[in-house]
């Protein structure tokens, strides 16, 4: 088996705003190192062609503060802000030669600041399977002025180029428990509102706009799945999966489709083994929950 590209230490799945702030300058430098490692890895793989990486000049402080004023009370997480200050958006694409034909295959992208725009998002979801033990209390939405109920969670588009669904930076969501060190078990936290589909929110405490936002994925069936606790973790996962088609589905109930699995098996078999092992753990946990519920 060919080794995965060297990406440094695995991201912490339960990172919070304070830890994120302390790590943000280092995280932005690590993002550059990770990108270079993946570029080298891709160029070394037989059949990979036309590896293209583009980035923009960093966003200025005035631009970053303007975004926060425009979308108040939401604030950019420190790691994402540090990334945007170095590179205001990025895109890495590559093609694959297969049976004598070269075609686009991998794509990794982070929106520029101006494209991190609000996404429509319903609130007050519940776990659709009734598995409340899958969810834990997370950052919560802010209280609406003059009311005793929490305002809706908010979401912003993180990757407008994703054709497999929507990648969102979500404020005030409830994250799943049991997430692995790199967020691999995040699919256990799929939740939806009865009558709608969105990340769960809580009204118990705190202000979601002040907390570290998480990264969620909405698949083409409109189901939301937790990806990572921080932007830094998401960036590392994106690179670990080489931007292969439908890689986000490794974190959903649907899982990877057969074609995606074939590409993973060829280009990064270790990653596929991890995905399959985590899915097996998830299925076993689901069986145990059903047995407990039947007692």
Language-model region placement:
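N-terminal processing/targeting junctions
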Residues: 127, 177, 182, 243-244, ...
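Intrinsically disordered, low-complexity domain-flanking/linker segments in eukaryotic proteins
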Residues: 133-141, 177-207
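Core residues of folded domains in eukaryotic genome-function proteins
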Residues: 154, 211-213
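Short, surface-exposed beta-strand/loop "edge" segments at domain boundaries and coil↔beta transitions
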Residues: 163-168, 178-179, 221-229
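Short Lys/Arg-rich cationic patches that frequently serve as NLS/NoLS or arginine-rich RNA/DNA-binding motifs
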Residues: 188-198, 282-295
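Compact beta-sheet-dominated globular domain cores
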Residues: 213-223, 229-254
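Short linear, low-complexity motifs centered on an aromatic residue
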Residues: 246-270
């Amino acid at each position: 088996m060919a080794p995965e590209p060297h990406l440094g230490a695995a991201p912490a799945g339960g990172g919070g705003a304070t830890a994120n702030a302390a790590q943000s300058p280092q995280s932005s430098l690590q993002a550059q190192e990770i990108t270079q490692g993946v570029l080298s890895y891709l160029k070394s793989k037989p059949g990979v062609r036309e590896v293209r990486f583009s980035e923009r000049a960093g966003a200025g402080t005035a631009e970053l503060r303007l975004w926060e004023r425009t979308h108040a009370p939401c604030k950019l997480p420190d790691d994402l802000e540090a990334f945007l200050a170095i590179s205001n958006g990025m895109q890495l694409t590559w093609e694959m030669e297969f049976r004598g034909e070269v075609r686009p295959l991998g794509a990794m992208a982070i929106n520029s600041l101006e494209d991190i725009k609000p996404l429509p998002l319903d609130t007050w979801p519940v776990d659709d399977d009734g598995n409340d033990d899958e969810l834990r209390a997370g950052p919560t939405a802010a209280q609406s002025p003059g009311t005793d109920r929490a305002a809706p969670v908010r979401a912003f588009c993180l990757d407008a180029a994703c054709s497999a669904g929507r990648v969102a930076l979500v404020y005030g969501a409830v994250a799943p428990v049991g997430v692995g060190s790199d967020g691999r078990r995040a699919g256990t936290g799929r939740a939806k509102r009865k009558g709608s589909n969105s990340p769960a929110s809580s009204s118990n405490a705190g202000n979601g706009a002040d907390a570290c936002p998480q990264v969620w994925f909405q698949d083409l069936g409109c189901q939301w799945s937790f990806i990572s606790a921080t932007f830094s973790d998401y960036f590392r996962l994106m690179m670990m999966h080489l931007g292969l088609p439908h890689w986000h589905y490794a974190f959903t109930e649907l899982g990877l489709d057969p074609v995606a699995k074939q590409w993973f098996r060829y280009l990064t078999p270790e990653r596929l083994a991890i995905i399959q092992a985590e899915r097996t753990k998830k299925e076993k946990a689901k069986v145990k929950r059903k047995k407990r519920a039947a007692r």
